[in-house]
């Protein structure tokens, strides 16, 4: 059987129309623009209002990616949505499939928090390499504003909403060069959006649990320690599998969590700042959307050129992490 390669042939993104900057946040919690920027690098974030949804953002980002790739929705074989904040707990990918008019596409959600997009990328690539599908649409989208405690300045300053998408296509030359994924459930409590059960008696002798999800909780110091250790290791392992030296990288594309984290990982890998893609100043941490959103911006700005080699890494709740080395088509 002839080996089937994988290429990324298009990208797209979408952000909500409502903006919340640090000055406005200082009216909600005890903080300041200087405090937030010095600790996170974030200046503002975009937030979904009642007229928008995860589905609407994801659909908009997908259409932009399809347009760039010159592919119609009817050509899509598979849609994978990476999200932790679906419009419907049963899944949102199928609704996106319907909105796009991608009738023949199989569609499903995956949940790996801020690592989700890279897990989706690796998953989609396997369907192509196995000869099952030709065109795979990958979407990373999250609306974390739904689950933020807006009175907790440790977390409310960090998160924003958004969506990003890329299109994978089978090709003769393989542009997905290497990857490394990891999980560590022993540190699950460091970053969580937990279900809080409430007891409800439905009949004598029968009690069920009907509760809701609690706002995002995070141990920032432990997450930082985990990322600075695991992410450089994952990137180095992925580079080894790709047989590429680190100095051959054109770009480092990390999950846009915190500028301190981006700087620390780049320093560990001896990657100069001019090779580090960062847009979290304008969007904050958009979870699964952050990598495709940042990628789409630099592609459309003309910074990323055909043939550029990119090391992408996502990390977050689970705890989970992943790194992918790919070449822009």
From Swiss-Prot:
Keywords: Acyltransferase, Cytoplasm, Fatty acid biosynthesis, Fatty acid metabolism, Lipid biosynthesis, Lipid metabolism, Multifunctional enzyme, Transferase. One of its GO terms (molecular function) is 3-oxoacyl-[acyl-carrier-protein] synthase activity. Its EC number is 2.3.1.180. One of its GO terms (cellular component) is cytoplasm. InterPro entries: ACP_syn_III_C, ACP_syn_III_N, FabH, Thiolase-like. Pathway: Lipid metabolism; fatty acid biosynthesis. Residues 256-260 are annotated as: ACP-binding. GO terms for biological process: fatty acid biosynthetic process. It catalyses: malonyl-[ACP] + acetyl-CoA + H(+) = 3-oxobutanoyl-[ACP] + CO2 + CoA. It comes from the Bacteria. Pfam families: ACP_syn_III, ACP_syn_III_C. The active site is at 114, 255, 285. The keyword Lipid biosynthesis applies. It is found in: Cytoplasm. The keyword Cytoplasm applies. Catalyzes the condensation reaction of fatty acid synthesis by the addition to an acyl acceptor of two carbons from malonyl-ACP. Catalyzes the first condensation reaction which initiates fatty acid synthesis and may therefore play a role in governing the total rate of fatty acid production. Possesses both acetoacetyl-ACP synthase and acetyl transacylase activities. Its substrate specificity determines the biosynthesis of branched-chain and/or straight-chain of fatty acids. PANTHER family: 3-OXOACYL-[ACYL-CARRIER-PROTEIN] SYNTHASE (PTHR43091), BETA-KETOACYL-[ACYL-CARRIER-PROTEIN] SYNTHASE III, CHLOROPLASTIC (PTHR43091:SF1). Belongs to the thiolase-like superfamily. FabH family. The last Arg residue of the ACP-binding site is essential for the weak association between ACP/AcpP and FabH. Homodimer. This is Beta-ketoacyl-[acyl-carrier-protein] synthase III. It comes from Trichodesmium erythraeum (strain IMS101). The gene is fabH.
